[in-house]
């Protein structure tokens, strides 16, 4: 892998919550390249949310480190599973508010807001209070707020939960477009078909340990063993083996 294209490198991350007997993460590695989408997979309680919190700097690992290879740290934006907007404000007012938190000129803030609105197809909802928008529009608003930062790395945590198929397809297409224009994506989800559609690599965790990591096509091929029919069969193979071990 060319170090010049690496956006973020996490090496041997270990994190243990106070009062817990076992670490939530145990020696997790990840190298994210520019314009690469990595699916972050694992059962509930596998360590996905903890891993994301370390990448965001919300928690500090007890060992291991996170580094970047460029001249300056990458801009990281987060789309949480929970709604990250003010429900009593309109979509436009939410975008105005979050853009105002960035160190931008008025002209640049207006430009980014306009780009986010058009990118996430919020034009007809811009003056509607967020609480009265559908689940799909609310998810699009979540993404639009993150895109105001023009991120180098976008962390998405279950971004399509509770939306209809049309809204899900739109969100997936938008993420795919971002990757194709050079944005790196870490995509945490339980929906295997979404990962298969937009991610070239995966990181599969369980009980804080890496069960599988790397190029998705290579992992599905079985690396000399019987190939897996799809990502779900690969997931079940590794997580069930973890239970047996």
Where are the language model's segments positioned?
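The feature captures the beta-strand-to-loop junction immediately N-terminal to the Walker
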Residues: 41-43
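Conserved ABC ATPase "signature" region
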Residues: 96, 100, 107-125
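Conserved ABC ATPase signature
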Residues: 129-136
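Catalytic Walker B motif of ABC-type/P-loop ATPase nucleotide-binding domains
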Residues: 154-158
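Helix-to-loop junction immediately C-terminal to a conserved catalytic motif
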Residues: 56
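A short, flexible loop at the N-terminus of ABC-type nucleotide-binding domains that lies
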Residues: 1-10, 14-27
